[in-house]
Regions:
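Helix-turn-helix
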Residues: 15, 19, 23-57, 61
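Solvent-exposed, amphipathic alpha-helical segments
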Residues: 19-26, 73-76, 157-164
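Generic transmembrane alpha-helix motif of multi-pass integral membrane proteins
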Residues: 113-120
Length: 192
């Protein structure tokens, strides 16, 4: 009998980034030290310093990884939609309010929230990779073929849902979420 190949364990850089995310999620940016990230990643401090020579470099890498993840999820959400006016807005609606085609989990949102807060409190310039992704998204929304303000309203509502989760302000019930989604969906229907 042939054994199935074992999955390759994550490389040291990925383990360090995963550990840093978990630390900022559990203890905030103040809890993130190079020593703690190295320990939790199972590498020496020298091994960590080989990849990231400072806390700022580590946080910067976390934000770049998050920006890449956001861009990939956003593009996948668009690809899942049919061509034509409102495609970007439908994707944003599904991404922000949930749909079978979206793969972002609560755990991913929580980790993203922790990284956003860590960067915001440590050095707001670290958010520049995220700002670049958002600028591309906004350009796509402007060219989406909907009446002015419709795509922006859908995006702002999705951002509001993320902020409510980020700051633990409230969690809408599934019924409330469905009602909001239906109301926002009417903004997209104008394009059809």
């Amino acid at each position: 009998m042939i054994d199935a190949p074992q999955p390759t364990p994550p490389d040291a850089c990925t383990r360090i980034l995963d550990a840093a995310e978990a630390i900022v999620q559990a203890r905030g940016v103040a809890g993130l030290t190079l020593e703690a990230a190295a320990r939790d990643a199972g590498v020496s401090k020298g091994g960590l310093l080989y990849h990231f020579n400072s806390k700022e470099a580590l946080l910067g890498a976390l934000l770049c990884r998050l920006a890449l993840f956001m861009e990939q999820q956003y593009r996948a959400a668009i690809e899942a939609q049919t061509e034509g006016p409102g495609r970007v807005s439908r994707a944003l609606l599904n991404w922000g309010f949930g749909d079978e085609g979206c793969t972002v989990t609560d755990e991913m949102h929580d980790r993203a929230a922790a990284v956003f807060l860590a960067a915001f409190h440590h050095d707001r310039a670290l958010l520049d990779p995220i700002r670049e992704v958002i600028a591309r998204m906004r350009a796509d929304m402007a060219a989406d073929g909907l009446p002015p303000g419709h795509a922006g309203a859908i995006n702002a509502a999705g951002d509001g849902m993320f902020m409510a989760r980020l700051f633990h302000l409230y969690t809408p019930s599934e019924a409330e979420r469905a009602e909001m989604r239906a109301a926002l969906g009417k903004l997209v229907e104008t394009a059809r």
